[in-house]
């Protein structure tokens, strides 16, 4: 068995597609009417479709999982984030863990938690 994709629920697929392209360079591989697959295996699912499948409420900012990305030049990434999405809501501004990794956490447009960190292997021990 193999993990194929990670799916997140979004209110506006086009805005979310642009967000993930702008910040992470993800491109669309398949658009299947409310179910969009991006490069790196991220799937955007229209909230209305997901709600019909589950018959449950969607809880933004539930903080129960996160999408994790690595970026060598995290300061340049933060500049880009703040330029393109100045009203982004941070969970943690830039911080450095005890093992030397720099990270930030913020919510995407729909309250999905994202962490961006410097590559772990590049930290001096």
Give the residues covered by each predicted segment.
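Short beta->alpha transition motifs characteristic of CBS
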Residues: 8, 46, 98, 105, ...
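Short glycine-enriched loop/turn motifs at secondary-structure junctions
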Residues: 1-3, 59-64, 97-98
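Conserved short beta-strand elements that form part of the metal-binding/catalytic scaffold
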Residues: 27-61, 113-118
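A generic "structured core" feature
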Residues: 17, 36-37, 45, 88-91
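N-terminal beta-strand motif that seeds the catalytic metal site of vicinal oxygen chelate
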Residues: 1-15, 65-67, 120-125
